[in-house]
Regions:
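Nucleotide-activated sugar donor-binding and catalytic core shared by glycosyltransferases
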Residues: 1-183
Length: 183
């Protein structure tokens, strides 16, 4: 709930700036969080629990970093990932060397070993940055096409069956290799 309270207002402000009358904003509710919790944030947007259907039909998504980024990629939805760090102004200053030395935070970027989707984390998670990235996702056809093309590599890496196990194995291998190079 805290994560939703911190992230959703910025996500919605950015989406409202970009959507205008051209796009409908849909909020996919998190499992276990009742609809009433979302009401103070929603101003005419649609609230749904059918996340997969929304991602299938969406032209673009703003996704809170986590497994949802991988799900959106496997569905084929262009996205940007956001993540709020509580006390981020102070924590970021303290943890900056660690936070920004990690090349990728999202599962998509970790598995594909590159910056496929934009990660707006800590102080980079602002309404302006999210709106800018959302505009790129919606209107820059080359950018969208490239992202979707890179998503196809996920199927090769993860395979057609046991995607979750393959993803876990790949992430474990990458983390193990990272630990070995840092020792």
């Amino acid at each position: 709930r805290s994560e939703i309270s911190h992230c959703l207002p910025t996500m919605l402000d950015a989406a409202r700036q970009v959507a205008g009358n051209e796009y409908q904003i849909i909020v996919a509710a998190a499992p276990g969080v009742e609809d009433a919790f979302y009401q103070p944030f929603i101003q005419g947007e649609i609230l749904t629990r059918d996340t997969y259907k929304v991602l299938t039909e969406a032209k673009a998504a703003i996704v809170n970093s986590g497994t949802a980024t991988l799900e959106a990629a496997l569905i084929g939805c262009p996205q940007t990932a956001v993540y709020y760090i509580a006390g981020s102004k102070y924590l970021e200053k303290l943890l900056r060397p660690i936070i920004f030395s990690i090349p990728n935070f999202t599962l998509v970027n970790i598995i594909l070993q590159g910056q496929v989707i934009q990660e707006l984390i800590a102080s980079r998670f602002t309404t302006e940055n999210v709106a800018h990235e959302l505009q790129r996702l919606l209107y820059d056809q080359e950018y969208r096409k490239n992202m979707l093309k890179q998503y196809q590599q996920l199927y090769t890496i993860l395979g057609d069956t046991s995607a979750a196990n393959n993803a876990a194995d790949k992430i474990y291998t990458l983390i193990s290799n990272c630990d070995e190079t840092n020792q």
